[in-house]
Structure formats: structure tokens, C-alpha cells
Curated annotation (Swiss-Prot):
Self-association state and partner proteins as the record states: Monomer. The ACDS complex is made up of alpha, epsilon, beta, gamma and delta chains with a probable stoichiometry of (alpha(2)epsilon(2))(4)-beta(8)-(gamma(1)delta(1))(8) (Potential).
Cofactor: [Ni-Fe-S] cluster
Transmembrane intervals: none
Organism this protein belongs to: Methanosarcina mazei (strain ATCC BAA-159 / DSM 3647 / Goe1 / Go1 / JCM 11833 / OCM 88) (Methanosarcina frisia)
Enzyme class: transferase
Function: Part of a complex that catalyzes the reversible cleavage of acetyl-CoA, allowing growth on acetate as sole source of carbon and energy. The alpha-epsilon complex generates CO from CO(2), while the beta subunit (this protein) combines the CO with CoA and a methyl group to form acetyl-CoA. The methyl group, which is incorporated into acetyl-CoA, is transferred to the beta subunit by a corrinoid iron-sulfur protein (the gamma-delta complex).
Official protein name in the record: Acetyl-CoA decarbonylase/synthase complex subunit beta 2
Family per record: Belongs to the CdhC family.
Catalyses which reaction(s): Co(I)-[corrinoid Fe-S protein] + acetyl-CoA + H(+) = methyl-Co(III)-[corrinoid Fe-S protein] + CO + CoA
EC number(s) reported in the record: 2.3.1.169
Family matches, as Pfam families: ACS_CODH_B_C (PF19436), CdhC (PF03598)
Amino acid sequence: MADEFPFEISPMFEGERVRKEGMFVELGGPKSLGLELVRAADMDAIEDDKVTIIGPDLKDMEEGKTYPWAMIFNIGGELVEPDLESVVERRVHDFINYCQGIMHLNQRYDVWMRVSKDTAAKMDSFEPFGKAVMMLFKTELPFIEKMQVTFYTDKDEVEKQMETAKEIFKARDARTKDLHDEDVEVFYGCTLCQSFAPTNVCVVSPDRISLCGAINWFDGRAAAKVDPEGPQFEIAKGDLIDAVTGEYTGVNEIAKKLSSGEFDKIKLHSFFDCPHTSCGCFEVVGFYIPEVDGIGWVDREYQGMAPNGIGFSTMAGQTGGGKQIVGFLGIGVNYFYSPKFIQADGGWNRVVWLPSKLKEKIDEAIPADLKDKIATENDASDIESLKAFLQEKNHPVVATWAAAEEEEEEEEEEEEVAVAAAPMMMPAAGFQMPAMPMMSGGSSGGIKLTFKNAKITIDRMIISEKKEKK
């Protein structure tokens, strides 16, 4: 495709990874700033196919280094409107990954790119790359009649663009505030991430934004309208099975179809039971902490360890890939604002830990009576300190601890009774237990066996008193 470019362009390169050892430069990512933004503009304000570079160009960059990065695309056309901005923006991921040797991950303000050594050897500027991406946009989305792009690699300029973009993203996300799942007849699906997560089924409803945070219900509707054969499409939600978990017949049907039968149920607002699949582009990952029966959340920006001793990248690797991983869940940041936020599993009453910056960022989403009860890395760095914090603040999960202990004691008593009532010889597992010391004389102490949370398959068990040899 397109012989005029210094690198190959084809959908076959989607999913290609540029590893660190093969990387010429890294743009954005966890060590720097990375941004992509699409803005609708008047046709007269756009110089078609123009590429502007503000900051060091590719030829000015040092091999192995990481640079700040921002891409601002302006699009124009008779059918172009602001509602389409986020739709076009999400396709940046597709089209950049069509370019051989250029890796693109994530979206919005979390963009992470790498240029391979092989590709960098064939071009000394980002200009042909920009022209290639715009060519793909106008070919695949013909409603875009004119397009220009500005690449920023100067740190101060990237920071300035980032500040402006975050306000734009915030305004976009606020649009679905008063619209809920029960108010609509259709949801929307997105398969953009299937190049990296083949079984991922992203379902976008009014109360649940896409995992990447880039597509809300209105964006899905606009995308399906202008590009019916594209990666965003209608999902007839069908019959309601469970309002609390967010289970619908239509969602289950599409889950089975798009995952090639790997999953047959997705419950939109459940953390544990048939949760939404997680790709790898999610903005935040939730993780269950069994020691406190609570859920923590960690985002891409947090570079430290969570109380469970694991960082974001490790948990993301465990969670992603388009799987349903019980105990982990990827989400978009805006889902924190949903009135149905993991409502099947306690909602905010189950949240026990957040990175401080994320907590500050979503402050308006957190119920007022819980703000001081949710720990950050400044309050708890491990399980023990988290337990102490939650007890001190009387977090709602603490009330479940006593109930769990009582249940455990009851189970223990039942197990003791069962052992006491059992015959001394029984079918058991093909092994003979070591002889156990017995109480001698007139002692009535007997034997006490306590099994806690044990699953034992026994074929034959013999318990006998050891007799002294005469």
C-alpha cells in the first residue's frame, strides 16, 4: 500500500510490538507525556495534508531516548461535526499501527509510541509518517475531506496542549451524565482492540464508557451512523436479565459471537461474576484484596506499588488480553462517575485504596462520606497498614470482617463435629496417616482434628492406638 512512503503500510502490521532492544525512540508512555486529540475545524482553516513539527524532529532525536509527544489532528468536511471528534480520534490507534515499525498504544492523554530502528533508518522526519496516517484516514473515512496534523515534541508545548485537551475530554465525558442504561434501546460495541486482544468484547452503554475512556454512548452512536461497517456498531440490548449486575440477553449474544464462544455472559456492572472483558487499553485496573474484602484501583500514571505489592504494568499484564479475570477488572476513568459503578459488588462501599493523584482527579465521583475512608499510598503501603487504616476510619468493609470471622468459626465447629461423629475407619485415599499419640490412662482428652478451608479426597483412613511391644 502506498509506495511513496519509506515504510510498508498494511493492516497486517496491527499488533506488531516494538521491543526495547529494537527501539530507536520512545514517544510518550509511562516515562513521559503522550497525547492525541482530533478537532473539527472549518474547511478554510485547514491546509490539506500539512504536517507541522514543533520541537525536535526524528533526525534530531537520540537513539534509545524517550520524548514527550502530542498529536493534534484538524479535520474538515461537509459531514464533519464535533460529535465525530472522539470517533476519529479512536481510529488513530488503528492507522498508526498499520505503519510498519511504529507501535501505538493507549489513547487520549496516555499515548505510548515507539519507532523501530529499522523504520528510523528509512526516514529522518515525522513528516512522511504524518502524511501516511492522514492518507489512511481519508481513505477509510471519506467524510473527512481535509486534514492537517501538528506533532509536538517540545516539553513545554506538550504540557500546554495536554492542559487544553484534558478540559476537552472532561466536557465530552459529561454529556452522558443524565442518560442511563434503562433510557435507551441499544448499546454500542467496539472491536478496535481486538488486534491486541482477540477475544475482547467492549460494550459501551450510557452508564459504562469504553475501557479506553475514549468512546461514550454518544460517540458510539455517531460512529455507527457515519461508518456502519466500522469497528463501532449497534448492540440491541435485548431483555433485561438482572438490573443490578447489568446483564442483558443482547449483550450476552454479542459476547459469545465476538469472543468466538469463549464467553457467553458479560455483566456490565459486576466485578466478580462474569465481569466485562479487559483489553489492554484500559485506563485503570481494579484488583481484589481478599485480606480486607475490598477493591483497590490503580491507573497508568501511578508508578509505585499497590498494597498487594504489585504495580500497574504487572496487573495490566495479568488483566488484559480480552479475558474475564475474576479479581481484576479494567475500566475507563469515567466509569467511576457512573451511578451503576460495580453496583453488583458494593459500588463505592467496596473501594478501599486509590493512588492519591487518581483520588484527587475523581474527587467529585467519590461519595462525601467515603472520601476520608479510602486510603492512598500516603496512608497504606501494604496490607497490614491498609487494615489498620480501614479500621481506624471505620470503612464499610470492616463490618464484613466480623461476619466473615463468625462464619469461619461456625464452619470450623461443623468440621469438628463431623470429625468427631465419623467412624474410626472409613473409605480413604490410599495412604495411611502416621500413628498419632493417644492420651493414656484415664484421660478423657481424646483427639481433636480441625480442618480449615481444606479439600481432602480420602480413600481409606486408619486411626489406631499404637500398642507397645511386649
